[in-house]
């Protein structure tokens, strides 16, 4: 038997079981738990390599030949951290394991035959993750979509109609006409999209109309009046049509305090946006909601991780996004009530404890649409550096923490909004929304983004160069983003009632439309690696946060990982 060193093996086929990989310039190390490829039978494309006719590429005719295979990929997912080939057919993941030619190789997965029909994407030395899911989008500008895509986000859920005052402040697409217009606009993009209707109404017929018009859920926002009545009516309609309700609660406590909101919610499942409160919500103690079993708590990315500049930058953001005036003292007091360093300091720690379940952006409305993934990993790194390894870790690695944090922007938002059957993880049967990263660039600069198995965006060099790599290397849309291909590379998520009533045909849409499902029968316990339920207390005078009588806080950092080292500007 021929043996080679681990270093030589990794340089040829990527790391294998027991190897550790550093994520970007963070202090996080992922260790491969299992290698599903077969030593000596690895498949690899290139001159003198194995994917050639009659070798690792079958010369026989198989009906299950793959459309594409990602070879020797290191997968980081809530399901595990492991090495495998990924087989793609018809836009979906059909196999994870050993791909190749069953006529000449052992242990080839019968669903993963490489043949004349198969394109090869080299995964050696790359990390593969599921595409990110951002569930807090203000659709203020369509230019957000490529920015998010180039960061590794493949699904955007939110509301709005453009740079209107209502959209600048709230994630709502109000009414049937606006909803239909946004569904039509979605046709232009190789990005999964879904839209919230406006959930603030004591008239349930108006809410139902929006669900029937194609809304995948409702958003209740304080700028429209997050009253107990509005909350109750929105949840009534959501229960009826199996959609999710997202909420931005009442900062000013005009219609009630956090206890009144929880009473109106009445144990029903709801997705709470920016649950820390700087982005909005009952001052000073909306953060208490994060510990409840029916609350799916999320953060928006300006407050994570907590840095020396976090509190200062929030005041100006708030004045702009919520149509406030610095010359009006009541507006300034409103802004000041939301920016509390004590609760912001607790937020990172609550994420690390698995109490906060989801991260999102709040795009252009106190949030950065291209930084969900980056800030999630910055927070993970900050917490490791401050608090050390989690007690759940096994061995000299950070695998548990890594699974906890990747779940926050992949599987958990998918579960929360009823789309986890389709996207949110690297699993057989799901659409192949996948992101490839060099380990050194992990979390900030992806190499390539696949939607439904086709490359829709990637880093690419000078188009007039003789090879693909010369500078300037920039992100650009790829063929999956063009022509009619984009209709098969992206999904619009709608309510089941709209899907069943053939909204696609009614509006003449060409994209894939799919219904959300199982939004109402989930709880915090369904949040992967982030399901901790515990009482949280907030001191109303000092804003100190406590869990089990222990003060929860963290220090503001002077410098973050995945920062200026990777960015010219």
From Swiss-Prot:
Post-translational modification: Carboxylation allows a single lysine to coordinate two nickel ions.
Catalytic activity: urea + 2 H2O + H(+) = hydrogencarbonate + 2 NH4(+)
Keywords noted in UniProt: Cytoplasm, Hydrolase, Metal-binding, Nickel
Positions bound to Ni(2+) 1: 136, 138, 219, 362
Record pathway: Nitrogen metabolism; urea degradation; CO(2) and NH(3) from urea (urease route): step 1/1
Protein name: Urease subunit beta
Organism, as annotated: Helicobacter hepaticus (strain ATCC 51449 / 3B1)
EC numbers for this chain: 3.5.1.5
Assembly mode: Heterohexamer of 3 UreA (alpha) and 3 UreB (beta) subunits.
Binding site for Ni(2+) 2: 219, 248, 274
Gene field: ureB
GO molecular function: nickel cation binding; urease activity
Residue stretches making up the Urease domain: 131-569
Compartment annotation: Cytoplasm
């Amino acid at each position: 038997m021929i043996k080679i060193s681990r270093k030589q093996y990794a340089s040829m086929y990527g790391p294998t079981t027991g190897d550790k990989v550093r994520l970007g310039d963070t202090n996080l190390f992922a260790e491969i738990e299992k290698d599903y490829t077969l030593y000596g039978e690895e498949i690899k494309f290139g001159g003198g390599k194995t994917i050639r006719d009659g070798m690792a590429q079958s010369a026989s005719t198989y009906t299950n030949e793959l459309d594409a295979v990602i070879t020797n990929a290191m997968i980081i997912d809530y399901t595990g951290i492991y090495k495998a080939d990924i087989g793609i057919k018809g836009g979906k993941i059909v196999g994870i394991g050993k791909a190749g030619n069953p006529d000449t190789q052992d242990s080839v997965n019968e669903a993963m035959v490489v043949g004349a029909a198969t394109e090869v994407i080299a995964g050696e030395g790359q990390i593969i993750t599921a595409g990110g899911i951002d569930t807090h989008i203000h659709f203020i500008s369509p230019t957000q979509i490529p920015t998010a895509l180039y960061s590794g986000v493949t699904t955007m859920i939110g509301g709005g109609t453009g740079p209107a005052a209502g959209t600048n402040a709230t994630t709502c697409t109000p009414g049937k006409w606006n909803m239909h217009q946004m569904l039509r606009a979605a046709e232009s993009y190789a990005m999964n999209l879904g839209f919230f209707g406006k959930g603030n109404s004591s008239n349930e017929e108006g809410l139902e109309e929006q669900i029937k018009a194609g809304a995948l859920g409702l958003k209740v926002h304080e700028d429209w009046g997050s009253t107990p009545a509005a909350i109750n009516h929105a949840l009534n309609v959501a229960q009826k049509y199996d959609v999710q309700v997202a909420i931005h609660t009442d900062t000013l406590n005009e219609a009630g305090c956090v206890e009144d909101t929880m009473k109106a919610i009445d144990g029903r499942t709801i997705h709470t946006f920016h649950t820390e409160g700087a982005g909005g919500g009952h001052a000073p103690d909306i953060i208490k909601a994060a510990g409840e079993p029916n609350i799916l708590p999320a953060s928006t990315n300006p407050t994570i991780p907590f840095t020396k500049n976090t509190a200062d930058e929030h005041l100006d953001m708030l004045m702009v996004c919520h149509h406030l005036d610095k010359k009006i003292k009541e507006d300034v007091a409103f802004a000041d009530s939301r920016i509390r360093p004590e609760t912001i300091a607790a937020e990172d720690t609550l994420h690390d404890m698995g109490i906060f379940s989801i991260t999102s952006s709040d795009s252009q409305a106190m949030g950065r649409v291209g930084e969900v993934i980056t800030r999630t990993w910055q927070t993970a790194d900050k917490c490791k550096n401050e608090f050390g390894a989690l007690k759940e870790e096994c061995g000299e690695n950070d695998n548990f923490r890594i699974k906890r944090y990747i779940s926050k922007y992949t599987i958990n938002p998918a579960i929360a909004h009823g789309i986890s059957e389709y996207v949110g993880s690297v699993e057989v049967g799901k659409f192949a929304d996948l992101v490839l990263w060099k380990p050194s660039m992990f979390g900030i600069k992806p190499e390539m983004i696949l939607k439904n198995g086709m490359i829709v965006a990637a880093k690419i060099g000078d188009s007039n160069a003789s090879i693909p790599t010369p500078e300037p290397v920039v992100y650009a849309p790829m063929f999956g983003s063009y022509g009619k291909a984009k209709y098969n590379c992206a999904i619009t998520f709608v309510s089941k009632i709209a899907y069943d009533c053939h909204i696609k045909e009614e509006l003449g849409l060409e994209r894939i439309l799919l219904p959300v499902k199982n939004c109402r029968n989930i709880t915090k316990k369904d949040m992967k690696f982030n399901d901790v339920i515990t009482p949280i207390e907030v001191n109303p005078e000092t804003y100190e946060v406590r869990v089990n009588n222990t003060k929860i806080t963290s220090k503001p950092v002077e410098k973050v990982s995945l920062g200026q080292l990777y960015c010219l500007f």
